[in-house]
Amino acid sequence: MASPDIFVEDYSAAVDFLGKQKFVDRERISAIGICGLGSHVLTAAAIDVRIKVVATSVMYDMSDSMWKGLNNTKTEEQRELEKDYLAKMRWQEVDEGPVGGPHELAFDENNKPIYWSKMFPDKLPADADPVTKQFFDYYVGRAFHPRSVNSNGAWDALTPWSYYNFPLQQRIETIKQPKLIVTGEKAHARYMAEEAYNRLKDPKELVIVPNATHVDLYDQMDKIPFDKFDEFFKENL
């Protein structure tokens, strides 16, 4: 199960823990969020000013992506269909216990919700879109783990529920701490990083990694701009 409140609180709880360590300077604690955690870390930093520096890499605004769809393609009709779907899933969980399902609901050619109980099939169809293939190659391939939800299971079917009610990044314009936003030139969610960057106030920096896709910046050591992250944190802490 994912929840915007829990994920945001995780960052503040991590600051709590670090701040209790004798070897940690409480005035030099920073945070970074990758993919969906990018929107959560900005949300956390807007209120928790103990986070002195914040960075994101290939950030995803999970609440926007769930509610509006990738590239804002979800229709009002689809949102109503999804509410009906979530209501059915909730009753099913009441009667039977937890039910696995997608954290972002897709629709078929007849505008019907597509339900599945596993994030990825064992084998992708030949006509799979490039973004799905990139995620598949990562989660089912080189980053596979038997206990990973994305590798070998599914999220709770009710995951979108809380994200619909409680959008992320509501106050990121108030973040005064230094901010670094990194994304890939070819990342399918690049626009989310750019939209967040445009809302942020100085000091801020946007880095677009040439030829990098979203998933490239998960683990491709030759594309992740480690030097930039290192420079940013050293200069601002």
Q: Each PLM stretch: what is its role?
A:
Residues 1-22:
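Alpha/beta-hydrolase active-site loop
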Residues 43-134:
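Alpha/beta-hydrolase-fold enzymes
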Residues 69, 154-171, 177:
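Active-site nucleophile elbow and catalytic-triad environment of alpha/beta-hydrolase enzymes
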Residues 175, 181-183:
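Short beta-strand/loop motif that positions the catalytic acidic residue
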Residues 210-237:
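Catalytic active-site module of serine/aspartate enzymes centered on a nucleophile-bearing elbow/loop
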